[in-house]
Every structure is written in structure tokens, then in C-alpha cells.
């Protein structure tokens, strides 16, 4: 049975409100997003998280910072992001969180008259060395814990990012998140790549899209074949965040899933 979760939303001002939405909509989990100030790792109350989880029968996944530049050439920046991941791993061990969702930063870019070059692309060897070191440290820190860091597609994986993702996937502690709305908005840049690693696909972000590359829409109101992606997620035993941006849209999306999907 496919397990559905709620994303963190601006209108959910407290953890209690977010858990209440999960309970009211009969969702299985909440994806805690540490981009939000109240969900910064240092702000999280482990006892409260555990108590609410046990009381309401839900679990958590964790969405890491959007700008997760773990291979930045500036060591101070890279160290900060890497430490965030390492701290998230320790929190996940404490709370039994099994999936961490992570973006892959494209990094800074250099604009020429005829094209744009990304520094990670221009200095790919050094970039991949940093990715490899990050992979090894995460593998060591996770150890035999049941935790997977799931790399999410965002604006379309560029070739140097695909190489980095494949390096990460050499470790069993890494997997993939398939964001179907981001894939559509990038012109289907990522689906073939992700499905070529289908055995490592662990997590989905599900939302509909409308023409004009506008995503995070209510399920059933846009152009995506959402049913096909839900079937794939269920086939692979994945979890799925219904990643709308308002509670009302989330409610309508869950109604659509239970009625039409």
C-alpha cells in the first residue's frame, strides 16, 4: 500500500498544526522541511516529535535545505552544508527517520557571450572528488542504520550532476526522489535518467502541472499522468509526498487520489 505524506507549508505555523492536518487527511507521514525557521535542526524538539508521532500514528521524512551545496569550492560553505547533513543523520537515528530528501546544487556559473558554464562543470574533477568524500562520510556515519539520503531532481540534472548522482549511488545509503512536477517543468530532462536507476528510487514528490511550466498544482487539475506515476511509486514500494502548497489543495488532491486514482 502506497504511503502518502504532507509537505511542510507556510500556513502550518506549528508542528502540532502540521500533524493535525496529517491526522485529518489520514496521511501516513509528514515531511519536515528544514528550510523553515521553526524546523531548523537546532529548533526541533525531539521529545515532542516522538510523542506526536506515537500519539497520531505517523512517521517523518526530512527535507534538507534547498541550496545544499555540499561540494562548494568555498570550504566554509561546504562544511556548513555537510555538517547539516551529518546532524540530520544523527537526528534521524534518534527519531527513526528513514528518508532524507536532498537537492543537488548546480553551484555558481560563469556567463560567456554564447553560453553559460557552471564552475562544477569547468572543474569537474575537483567537484567529483568532493562528492566522493561526502559520500564516504555519509556512508560511515549512517553505518547499518536504515536511513537513505534520497537525491531529488529539481531543474533538470546537468551532465556533471548526473555523474555526481551516480557516484553517490555507488553507496547503498543513497537513493533517488522523483519529483514529477519538476521533471515536467524541466522538459522531461530527468525521467529517463531516474528510471535507468529505478532500483534506487525510494521517494516521490507528487504534484500536478499546468501549461506554462507551472507546478505544485492540485492533483487531477493539470496535464500530468499522475495515475501512472502513482502506480510506479506503489510498484517500487516508495513513499509519496503530495507536494501542494496549501492545505486546501492537499485536501482536494487526497480526495482525487481516493476517488479517481
Predicted feature residues:
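Active-site beta-loop-alpha junctions enriched in small/polar residues
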Residues: 7-11, 33-37, 65-69, 105-107, ...
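Catalytic-core regions built around general acid/base machinery
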Residues: 44-57, 126, 130-141, 193, ...
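Active-site acidic/histidine proton-transfer and metal-coordination neighborhood
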Residues: 54-55, 74-175
Amino acid at each position: 500500500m502506497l504511503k502518502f505524506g504532507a509537505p511542510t507549508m507556510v500556513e502550518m505555523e506549528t508542528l502540532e498544526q502540521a500533524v493535525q492536518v496529517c491526522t485529518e487527511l489520514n496521511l501516513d507521514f509528514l515531511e519536515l522541511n528544514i528550510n523553515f525557521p521553526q524546523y531548523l535542526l537546532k529548533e526541533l524538539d525531539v521529545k515532542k516529535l516522538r510523542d506526536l508521532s506515537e500519539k497520531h500514528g505517523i512517521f517523518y521524512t526530512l527535507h534538507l535545505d534547498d541550496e545544499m551545496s555540499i561540494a562548494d569550492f568555498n570550504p566554509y560553505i561546504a562544511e556548513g552544508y555537510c555538517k547539516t547533513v551529518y546532524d540530520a543523520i544523527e537526528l534521524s537515528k534518534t527519531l527513526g527517520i528513514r528518508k532524507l530528501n536532498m537537492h543537488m546544487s548546480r553551484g555558481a556559473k560563469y556567463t560567456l557571450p554564447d553560453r553559460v558554464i557552471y564552475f562544477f562543470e569547468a572543474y569537474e574533477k575537483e567537484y567529483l572528488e568532493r562528492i566522493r568524500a561526502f559520500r564516504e562520510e555519509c556512508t560511515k556515519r549512517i553505518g547499518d542504520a536504515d536511513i537513505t539520503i534520497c537525491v531529488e531532481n529539481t531543474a533538470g540534472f546537468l551532465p556533471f550532476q548526473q555523474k555526481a548522482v551516480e557516484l553517490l549511488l555507488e553507496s547503498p545509503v543513497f537513493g533517488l526522489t522523483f519529483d514529477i512536477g519538476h521533471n515536467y517543468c524541466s522538459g522531461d530532462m530527468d525521467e529517463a535518467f531516474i528510471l535507468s536507476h529505478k532500483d534506487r528510487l525510494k521517494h516521490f514528490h507528487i504534484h500536478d502541472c499546468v501549461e506554462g511550466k507551472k507546478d505544485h498544482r492540485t492533483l487531477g487539475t493539470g496535464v500530468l499522468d499522475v495515475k501512472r506515476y502513482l502506480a510506479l511509486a506503489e510498484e517500487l514500494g516508495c513513499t509519496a509526498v503530495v507536494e501542494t502548497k496549501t492545505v486546501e489543495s492537499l485536501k482536494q488532491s487526497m480526495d482525487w487520489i481516493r476517488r479517481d486514482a
